[in-house]
Amino acid sequence: MSDIAITICILALVAVIGLWIGHWKIRGVGLGIGGVLFGGIIVAHFMNQNGLKLDAHTLHFIQEFGLILFVYTIGIQVGPGFFASLLSAGLKLNGLATLIVVLGAVSVFVLYKVVNVDLDIILGIYSGAVTNTPSLGAGQQILTELGIENANSTMGMAYAMAYPFGICGILLSMWLIRLFFKIKVEEEEKQFQKASGQDKESLTTVNVKVTNPNLSGLRLIDIPGFDNKDVVCSRLKRQENISVPSADTIIAIDDVLHLVGEINALKKMKLVIGEEIDMPMTHLAGDLRSERIVVTNEKVLGKRIKHLGIHKKYGVVISRLNRAGVELVPTANTALQFGDVLHIVGRSDTIGNATSIIGNAQQKLQQVQMLPVFIGIGLGVLLGSIPFYIPGFPVALKLGLAGGPLVVALILARIGSVGKLYWFMPPSANLALREIGIVLFLAVVGLKSGGGFVDTLVHGQGLEWMGYGMFITFIPLMITGIIARLYMKLNYLSLCGLLAGSMTDPPALAFANAIKEDSGIAALSYATVYPLSMFLRIMSPQLLAILLWTAM
């Protein structure tokens, strides 16, 4: 067999063993995809005993390409909600997640100075302690730039030592916070539901009867509140007739307006217009119907809603827009992206015409445009290779193969499309590429570090490294958890999701979800902090490496 064939067979063996190990669970918690790392260590141990070696250049390429695939698809997945999470109600949660990352970096700095651990070892321990594989790849790249030899193998070994408690430490933190504050989960869920009912930001509807005589004869757009674009009027009932109003529709007393918007905005509109009435207009007889359609027509990508002309031509109004799971109030200036889900209302005989303009071709949602994928990867690698010179630093700072593709993917996913190119990727395709990438990366890391793993654990400093990893995992989580609960009064279920998301750890999310099944509270906060946390986890080892290198 050729060297390439042998290498591929070994990688396949590592993946099979590792994924099998990852499926082992103790009380519902397992290593997950991290099992591939230990599969690589096991195979490498026996390869080392039998004197079998693989081509280093081939392994290096596979490792880097796997990392690029993983971080790029992560960026495409979380990009649409990344910038929104920084500006919306997730600001507090993202601030706490940032605190966890900063405290972790401080812990690394303290350990490096106090116990005099080698730079490659402490960065490997850090990546394992926070259970973040792209962090490992970013650290390995910057250490190679600094000229540290054997950084790949030693960092991988240290990562493997710290990884198991990295998972267990998150779960232990959740349990101790619950014990310390004597938290009752049922009450936490009720409090969250009550608070979310008062401050809910998702869209809702209300029917308001016009009783304010000052509004009679005004155009719809001239009513105070509609100019803020926070509320949409999707239907108007006048006597027994239901129609789709336009901005120029003249309002009369006793008209019933079907409004869509956030609760606080709707409350203000009711004060201006009149009284709320219990009249489900969606069930009234008439020639109107509503549909949910998906933007798939390449010709409308990037176009503003006002330029579609579907209201003037067909009397159709867009009442809601769902983008990457986030509901938005559409305005005339909202630009459409591939995969946007629109809730439209119009006459039965014309709504089909509007649908054909927007697309709604379900088969396109299952197709992957490969050209944008490779454009994005290429741009990401180029960005990651650009040096940033900072006075006083011994080497130029780079985003690297972990940071560059991630940043580009976040930006492209936020843009959505350029001309006929769109960066939407079906969830199944995204997951497949992401899993292939991380399996390849972890398999090679395990193979590179596994030769001396057992010897380091039994006869070397393996147990010490585990202890350092526990410190880096546990201290930031507990400090932030106590601050969030004691001073910021954060809901416990949201706090559990925050802890799991700040460590970008799916097994911890599974544990948090199991605390109160079917609530979805932990998953919501996890998704809120995950994008920023992933970005910070990739950048932090590079900054730590340069700062600690200059302090040597």
From Swiss-Prot:
First-listed, main subcellular location of the protein, grouped into a coarse class: membrane
InterPro entries: AAE_transporter (IPR050144), RCK_C (IPR006037), RCK_C_sf (IPR036721), Transpt_YidE_put (IPR023018), YidE_YbjL (IPR006512)
Molecular function GO labels: monoatomic cation transmembrane transporter activity
Biological classification of the source: Bacteria, Pseudomonadati, Pseudomonadota, Gammaproteobacteria, Pasteurellales
Subcellular location: Cell membrane
PANTHER family (UniProt xref): K(+)_H(+) ANTIPORTER SUBUNIT KHTT (PTHR30445), TRANSPORT PROTEIN YIDE-RELATED (PTHR30445:SF3)
Originating organism: Histophilus somni (strain 129Pt)
Domain (RCK C-terminal) ranges: 190-275, 277-360
Protein name from the UniProt record: Putative transport protein HS_1470
Similarity annotation: Belongs to the AAE transporter (TC 2.A.81) family. YidE subfamily.
Alphabetical list of Pfam families matching this protein: Asp-Al_Ex, TrkA_C
